[in-house]
Regions:
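Phosphate- and other anionic-substrate recognition elements at nucleic-acid/protein interfaces
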Residues: 1-5, 9-137
Length: 137
């Protein structure tokens, strides 16, 4: 299994993909005011047998590390210390925008969009990672 993580200031989205099917799906949204996302993701990785965790990197449209990069770098360091799974970083540009548009197109209510948007953004990022890895083969 592979976990995908979309890091946000208030919520952290998590998605999962099977190494064989290579199809990402949203799993959960972690409210950072109620749980330490590093602990929860490490537990998910252990429980699901994930050997890889892909964390979205906040890049600007120009491809440079954005303002949230320092927080993400610290998060990745803490996650690497908390789990035996490999941790990689991957471009998360526009994933939240794509997630929001997809949810709107599906007719999701504002409350539903708010509740699942971050997990769907993690799904979009993880699927992008998987597709890019497939193209490199």
């Amino acid at each position: 299994m592979i976990l995908g993580v979309d890091l946000g200031a208030r919520r952290v989205g998590v998605a999962v993909a099977d190494r064989e099917t290579r199809f990402a799906r949203p799993v959960e949204v972690i409210d950072v005011s109620h749980a330490d996302p590093v602990d929860r993701i490490a537990a998910l990785a252990r429980d699901l047998g994930a050997g890889l965790i892909v964390v979205g990197t906040p890049l600007t449209l120009a491809g440079e590390r954005g303002p949230a990069a320092a927080t993400q770098t610290e998060f990745v360091a803490r996650l690497r210390a908390a789990t035996t799974a490999a941790v990689e970083e991957y471009d998360e540009r526009l994933t939240t925008v794509v997630a929001e548009r997809s949810l709107r197109a599906a007719g999701a209510s504002a409350a539903t969009r708010r509740r699942v948007r971050d997990a769907v953004a993690a799904q979009v990022m993880l699927q992008g990672y998987l597709d890019a890895a497939d193209r490199e083969r």
